[in-house]
């Protein structure tokens, strides 16, 4: 009987521990939302940590990389921002905001020709989206 009680207590504690660790376990999308909120409130270091956590949870989280690129620009880490925005574009070449942000990063770096090419890609993609949206309006 004592062994059964001991096993039951051990099992209960183990189960509670597993449940509690899952309660504090955020998914990648939640980290991105957290990063956005931190950014809105001007807590850029916390935002960066949240975006990095999102990417760690899901290395294919496009919005995690996009947010991280924005933070890197604010920190004047333009090479890192460029890499982050290029990661977004590699995963989704139609992400027009990433093309714009990459152009902005290039402009900050003094790479005018690269900036203009990125802005042109942004304009083409945005124009296509606007055209599609206008056709869908009744």
Segment roles from a protein language model:
Residues 19-22:
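C-terminal motif of bacterial Sec signal peptides marking the signal peptidase cleavage site
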Residues 33, 67, 101, 135-136:
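Canonical tetratricopeptide repeat
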Residues 41-53, 75-87, 109-126:
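Structural signature of tandem alpha-helical TPR/SEL1-like repeats
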Residues 2-11:
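Bacterial N-terminal signal peptides that target proteins for export
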Residues 26-57:
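Alpha-helical segment of the N-proximal tetratricopeptide repeat
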């Amino acid at each position: 009987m004592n062994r059964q009680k001991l096993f039951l207590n051990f099992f209960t504690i183990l189960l509670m521990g597993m449940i509690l660790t899952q309660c504090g376990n955020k998914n990648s999308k939640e980290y991105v939302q957290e990063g956005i909120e931190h950014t809105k409130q001007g807590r850029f270091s916390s935002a960066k940590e949240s975006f990095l956590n999102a990417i760690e949870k899901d290395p294919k989280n496009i919005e995690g990389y996009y947010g991280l690129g924005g933070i890197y620009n604010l920190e004047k880490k333009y090479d890192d921002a460029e890499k982050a925005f290029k990661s977004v574009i590699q995963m989704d070449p139609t992400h027009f905001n990433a093309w714009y942000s990459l152009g902005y990063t290039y402009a900050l770096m003094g790479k005018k020709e690269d900036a203009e090419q990125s802005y042109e890609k942004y304009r083409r993609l945005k124009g296509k989206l606007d055209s599609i949206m206008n056709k869908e309006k009744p």
